[in-house]
Amino acid sequence: MQESIKPPVEVRYKEELQVLRNTDTGRRPENWRMSPMAVRTFILGSAQPVQYEGKEYHIEKKYFGNNALVERCIVTLAGNRGLMLVGEPGTAKTMLSELLSAAISGVSTNTIQGTAGTTEDMIKYSWNYALLLAKGPSREALVPAPLYVGMEKGILTRFEEITRTPAEIQDSLISVLSDKVLNVPELG
C-alpha cells in the first residue's frame, strides 16, 4: 500500500465520517453526504461520544478558530452558494475547505491550484487531441478538469489561491458560479 505524507481528510478521518453518516438523522441538502449539523459536528467536534453499533466514538475538534465562521460556511454551502475564504496566510483556510469538502462531498481532492499560469482548460476541460482528430468533438475526447468533474458529479471543487490567477480566469468563473452551468460549445 502506498503511503502519502499527508493523506486526504476523507482518509485520515474515515471512521469519524462513516460513523457520522450512518448515525445522521438530519435532512441532507441535495448531493450532500450528511446533514449540515453532522458537518458541523465533524469539523467542530462533539463533547458527547456518538453511539454506533454498540461502540462509543469520540468526534474530535479539527478546526480551532471561530465556530460562527464554520457555521456561516456551512449555511452558505447549504444554500447552494459559492464560498470564498479570504485571509492572511496560515489562518487555516485550506484546512477548513478540505474539512468541508470531505464532509459534504466525501472527497477533498477535487482541487484547482491557482497560479499566474492557470488557463481555462486547467479548470474547466481540455481535449484528447488524438481522439478529437479521429472522432471530432465528443464526450469521449473531452478531458474533464476539476470544475467540470465537480459539476458533473455534484461535488465541491476547491480553488486554492484564486487571486493568483489572471483576471480573465477569475471572470470566466463568474458565469459558472451564478448560472451553475458549464457550457461546452464544441459539443453543441
Regions found by a protein language model. Name each.
Residues 2-188:
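AAA+ P-loop NTPase catalytic core and its hallmark functional loops
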